[in-house]
Amino acid sequence: MNGTEGPFFYVPMVNTSGIVRSPYEYPQYYLVNPAAYAALGAYMFLLILVGFPINFLTLYVTIEHKKLRTPLNYILLNLAVADLFMVFGGFTTTMYTSMHGYFVLGRLGCNIEGFFATLGGEIALWSLVVLAIERWVVVCKPISNFRFGENHAIMGLAFTWIMAMACAAPPLVGWSRYIPEGMQCSCGIDYYTRAEGFNNESFVIYMFICHFSIPLTIVFFCYGRLLCAVKEAAAAQQESETTQRAEREVTRMVIMMVIAFLVCWLPYAGVAWWIFTHQGSEFGPVFMTIPAFFAKSSSIYNPMIYICLNKQFRHCMITTLCCGKNPFEEEEGASTASKTEASSVSSSSVSPA
């Protein structure tokens, strides 16, 4: 039989050798050409090379500049922390195992890598949900006189960690499990088997409902209402130049948010669901590897979209990188003033700021 196997699991996968070996003990070069593992390692190195500096810079700049320490930015910092979890807990491990061609760190290492990668991804996902809810409540005002304060931010942080732990921790204690996936160099939830005693079916269904479908629905609802509010406000002000500019900025921001969310998570979720509903069917190892690494790339998309497109943060970041002096200060100041003029639909009120 073709595939890969380990303690208490067998995953059928297409290969021409007919060899079946444990991904914890032997190189999996019979599944994919060794060059593919080298390419995977190089890709993970690139994610580390980009993901660590941009997320670390986010933390450093926010701590250094007092005006960035706002309640909403607590959530943005949480997003950066989540991405760093993915970089250190997942990317470094995957790069190391890719260099060996199998999950050389064993079952314990698989549990650790799977847990931290899942935890980081879920913290990031639920942080985006909290941001979407905050933007909807503040801009669309379903609750009159609501002001997002420090207590709300702390509750939002606690919520993201609780939801992330509710997804990442159960496989460590027997409700499902972490096993090597794709090219067997990274670990994820067991979508592949119905092994007795692990209740994989119930966990996967729970995860897809509570940790994918619901967040996706919330994000689409909140940003859909956000766009409507911006259009209504622009129309009420007879579409002045500043409000039109704000509307364009917000529209571009929201479109990028939605596209990034779908690019990162929809392919992985779709392939995982297909594997879950077609257990026993053969599939190529690359079939799961490609979408899994699309999801990992969210550690780069998140800070670029949610932070680097924020003019106030960009101003502070440039000031920090240029040793306290911003060579573009005049341009940034004029842009900020323009945004302030369109206060009712300002992108500083719609985009995370």
UniProtKB/Swiss-Prot annotation:
Q: How is it modified after translation?
A: Phosphorylated on some or all of the serine and threonine residues present in the C-terminal region. Contains one covalently linked retinal chromophore.
Q: Where is this site: Plays an important role in the conformation switch to the active conformation?
A: 113
Xref: Gene3D superfamilies:
Rhodopsin 7-helix transmembrane proteins
**Which terms does the record give in the GO molecular function aspect?**
11-cis retinal binding; G protein-coupled photoreceptor activity
Biased-composition ranges, Low complexity, are 334-353
Q: List the disulfide bonds.
A: 110-187
By sequence similarity, the record places it as follows: Belongs to the G-protein coupled receptor 1 family. Opsin subfamily.
Report the protein name in the record.
Rhodopsin
- Biological source species: Sparus aurata (Gilthead sea bream)
> Which gene name does the record give?
rho
